[in-house]
């Protein structure tokens, strides 16, 4: 519910209940008088008592009061007693006690009732004050102010002066009797001679510019040397206030339960583990130990006793030798190192590592930076990490009997691990195989052999190396480096970038400008614990720090490499810079370079070193893996420990930033994925709709063609129908004519006369044509006879004249003879 309602401070409520109305005007109360407060005040005491039950049934967490200017209600802040956690009580019970006390004193029902006595209609508030000797001039002024405020009349000036006419017919307000006067601020007496405004002018402000002032007319006025005390009015009973609709709406928005204190407020107390990686790692290991069951804790305790026993046996073997060789002046290098070891300190570490870490973490860090003695390195590692347990031993034996799907990959990567002794190759395979079965989610990933090999070299049994690997993976957080998405590696790279930005902003900005990200060169640092580049002794020293401070110490080694090469890195461009980051970055800690710096012969040609890093780094890598003496391990570890300061609280801040960024990216990626899914769905729907549209379009075209054809058929049929109708009409007419003819007595009578004349003319013409035709035929016959006669005469002539006549040209003569015969007419019919 939104802020609303009003509050009565704790002290003011108790005073109102035990001492009367005057104690109710405390600084913590708030005025919530509604516009109909005057009408509420006219209710008699019997009606107030009748509604007391409804007032008591309201939420006990609300304490309502009012301030004179009628401001918006607010939530009641906890008082000092309520905010004190050790003395805090149930608020409901406390309020019930207050109500019981108020009911016993007769105060609760009468908070909003009229006072005993009366103010005569139109009378002055001073008259009412004169009726009660307890009430002074200040009380009378307050009554006048209450009456004026109830009516909503009077100018701001009159309200300040405490004058005004009382509402006609309104009963006077009764003040609760108190055993002793409460400590209330003094009230300003009404000045003599002040007159109230006429009734008709009440409610009209004197000036529009005073509206803002009217809202705060009850606040104390500040003048030179004077200060008006704040006077608060008494609200009506809650049951009366509930009748006002505006009050009820405001009450609905009130949050009845006080807001809880944020968790961060209770966790602001700093602890040593927030500023020390060693103590933080101790705390994490202790929490991991306490999270296990009793049987597992007993097994771990048994493992600790075995480790302490092994350490004691080792001390017994070296102490007699030290006594015998104490007088020998010349000792070999190994014996000299043994004499320099602070065995007393390491004994205290073995006996109680937690005490040493808490009380003397600085010395522990110094000793670890110098290196854990190699004779007891495995014991110290197992003691710090609580890794030795017969339960893990039994689990390891069981896992060895199960085949793994990663065996081929493990065999392939073991051949690349050159610093592992030959006799440890099979043990390394067994440990990696067992872990791939123990953690199927991780299985086996390239680079795990670089982490497991140093563990295996410093313990006596494979099961111990398996236990150390489990602790590094699960408890130290190395497992997250090898998960499919590598969340731990991504976080460490982000923390590395933030640390580099804080320690060397110039170098960080230079890399960012060139577009070089830490994932391009620092991934192998964290995955292999620098084992891919540094020799075995180097990796063992790094593991010493990791077991004591946690996997976070890798950030120190990564940052110190960047800081020491900053002068070279800021001068290189992209290609050479990336090559230098991958290979030439480690040349700073070559023993030769360290010796030159210590002798004051600093190598000034750093850029040349970066240019030849491609060729020289490869040879130095091979030499470091074989000899292990090229790098100065002590200087590297000490520089990282001393110059790079990292606190757990700082890393938690980076982690929170990364989680926030990752969450935003995850949400953005989820939105993108959701949009891609929706896009694919929409594309499928579009293709489906397009296919459906194509089918519908084809059907539409087919239907359109059919429609056109049908329309053509209809038109054709209509034409045929018309023709048939015409034919029917003609046939009908013929039929009617024939039927009419059959009904007539003489059929020829109906032949028209003109037709007969035409027929006669036609017959006459036909006769003429036939005559002409006969004549022509006769002529043709005559001509044919003439031709025959001529041919016969020619033949006779040629015989008579012989050869002479043969040479003469032939002359055709056509003799036309009249026709002997004549034409005759035949009757045509």
Swiss-Prot record:
Residues 101-115 have a biased composition (Low complexity). The keyword Transferase does not apply. One of its GO terms (molecular function) is GTPase activator activity. Residues 38-50, 142-151, 189-220, 800-811 have a biased composition (Basic and acidic residues). Residues 279-341, 666-803 form a coiled coil. Residues 1-243, 600-620, 790-812 are annotated as: Disordered. Keywords: Coiled coil, Cytoplasm, ER-Golgi transport, Exocytosis, GTPase activation, Protein transport, Transport. It is found in: Cytoplasm. Its main location: cytoplasm. InterPro entries: Rab-GAP-TBC_dom, Rab-GAP_TBC_sf, Rab_GAP_TBC_domain. Disulfide bonds: none annotated. It comes from the Eukaryota. Residues 371-550 form the Rab-GAP TBC domain. GO terms for biological process: endoplasmic reticulum to Golgi vesicle-mediated transport; exocytosis; protein transport. Belongs to the GYP5 family. PANTHER family: GTPASE ACTIVATING PROTEIN AND CENTROSOME-ASSOCIATED, ISOFORM B, RAB GTPASE-ACTIVATING PROTEIN 1-LIKE. This is GTPase-activating protein GYP5. The lineage of its organism: Eukaryota, Fungi, Dikarya, Ascomycota, Saccharomycotina.
């Amino acid at each position: 519910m939104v802020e609303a309602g009003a509050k009565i401070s704790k002290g003011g409520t108790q005073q109102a209940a035990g001492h009367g109305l005057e104690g109710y005007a405390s600084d913590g109360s708030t005025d919530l008088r509604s516009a109909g407060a005057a009408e509420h005040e006219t209710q008699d005491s019997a009606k107030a008592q009748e509604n007391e039950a409804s007032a008591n049934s309201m939420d006990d967490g609300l304490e309502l009061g009012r301030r004179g200017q009628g401001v918006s209600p607010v939530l009641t802040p906890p008082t000092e007693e309520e905010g004190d956690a050790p003395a805090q009580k149930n608020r409901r019970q406390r309020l019930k006690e207050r109500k019981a006390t108020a009911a016993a004193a007769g105060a609760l029902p009468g908070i909003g009732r009229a006072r005993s006595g009366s103010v005569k209609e139109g009378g002055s508030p001073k008259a009412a004050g004169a009726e009660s000797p307890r009430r002074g001039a200040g009380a009378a002024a307050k009554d006048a102010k209450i009456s004026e405020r109830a009516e909503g009349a009077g100018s701001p000036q009159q309200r300040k002066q405490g004058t005004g006419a009382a509402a006609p017919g309104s009963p006077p307000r009764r003040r609760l009797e108190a055993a002793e006067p409460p400590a209330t601020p003094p009230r300003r007496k009404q000045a003599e001679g002040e007159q109230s405004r006429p009734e008709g002018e009440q409610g009209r402000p004197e000036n529009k510019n005073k509206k803002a002032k009217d809202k705060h007319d009850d606040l104390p006025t500040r003048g030179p040397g004077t200060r008006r005390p704040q006077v608060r009015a008494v609200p009506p009973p809650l049951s009366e206030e509930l009748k006002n609709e505006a009050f009820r709406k405001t009450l609905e928005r009130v949050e009845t339960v006080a807001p809880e204190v944020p968790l961060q407020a209770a966790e602001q107390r700093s602890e040593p583990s927030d500023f020390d990686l060693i103590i933080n790692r101790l705390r994490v290991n202790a929490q991991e130990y306490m999270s296990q069951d009793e049987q597992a804790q007993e097994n771990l305790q048994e493992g600790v006793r075995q480790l302490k026993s092994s350490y004691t046996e080792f001390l017994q073997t070296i102490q007699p030798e030290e006594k015998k060789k104490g007088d020998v002046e010349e000792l070999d290098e190994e014996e000299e190192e043994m004499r320099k070891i602070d065995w007393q300190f390491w004994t205290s570490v073995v006996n109680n590592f937690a005490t040493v870490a808490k009380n003397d973490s600085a010395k522990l860090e110094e000793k670890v930076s110098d290196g854990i003695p190699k004779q007891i390195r495995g014991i110290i590692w197992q003691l710090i990490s609580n890794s030795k347990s017969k339960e893990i031993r039994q689990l390891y034996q069981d896992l060895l009997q199960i085949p793994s799907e990663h065996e081929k990959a493990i065999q392939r990567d073991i051949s690349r691990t050159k610093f592992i002794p030959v006799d440890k190759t099979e043990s390394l395979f067994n440990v990696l195989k067992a872990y791939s079965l123990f953690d199927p989610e991780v299985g086996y990933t390239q680079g795990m052999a670089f982490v497991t090999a140093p563990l295996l070299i410093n313990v006596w049994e494979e099961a111990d190396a398996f236990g150390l690997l489990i602790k590094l993976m699960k408890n130290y957080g190395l497992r997250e480096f090898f998960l499919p998405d590598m969340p731990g590696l991504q976080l460490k790279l982000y923390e590395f970038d933030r640390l580099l930005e804080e320690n060397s902003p110039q170098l960080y900005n230079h890399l960012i400008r060139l577009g070089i990200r830490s994932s391009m060169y620092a991934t192998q640092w964290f995955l292999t614990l620098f084992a891919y580049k540094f020799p075995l002794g180097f990796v063992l020293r790094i593991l010493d720090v990791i077991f004591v401070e946690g996997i976070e110490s890798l950030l120190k080694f990564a940052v110190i490499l960047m800081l020491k090469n900053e002068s070279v890195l800021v001068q290189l461009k992209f290609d050479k810079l990336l090559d230098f980051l991958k290979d030439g970055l480690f040349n700073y800690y070559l023993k030769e370079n360290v010796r030159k710096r210590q002798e004051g012969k600093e190598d000034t040609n750093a850029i040349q070193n970066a240019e030849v890093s491609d060729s020289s780094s490869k040879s130095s890598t091979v030499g470091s893996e074989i000899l292990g003496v090229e790098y100065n391990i002590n200087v590297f570890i000490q520089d990282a420990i001393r110059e790079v300061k990292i606190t757990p609280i700082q890393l938690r801040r980076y982690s929170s930033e990364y989680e926030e960024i990752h969450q935003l990216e995850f949400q953005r990626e989820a939105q993108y994925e959701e949009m891609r899914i929706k896009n694919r769905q929409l594309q499928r729907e579009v293709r489906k709709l397009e296919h459906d549209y194509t089918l519908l379009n084809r059907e539409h075209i087919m239907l359109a063609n059919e429609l056109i054809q049908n329309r053509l058929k209809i038109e054709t049929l209509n034409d045929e129908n018309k023709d048939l109708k015409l034919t029917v009409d003609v046939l009908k007419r013929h039929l009617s004519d024939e039927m009419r003819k059959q009904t007539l007595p003489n059929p020829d009578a109906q032949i028209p006369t003109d037709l007969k004349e035409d027929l006669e003319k036609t017959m006459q013409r036909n006769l003429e044509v036939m005559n002409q035709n006969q004549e022509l035929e006769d002529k043709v016959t005559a001509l044919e006879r003439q031709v025959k006669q001529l041919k016969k005469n020619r033949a006779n002539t040629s015989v008579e004249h012989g050869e002479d006549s043969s040479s003469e040209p032939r002359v055709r003569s056509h003799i036309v003879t009249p026709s002997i015969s004549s034409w005759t007419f035949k009757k045509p019919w």
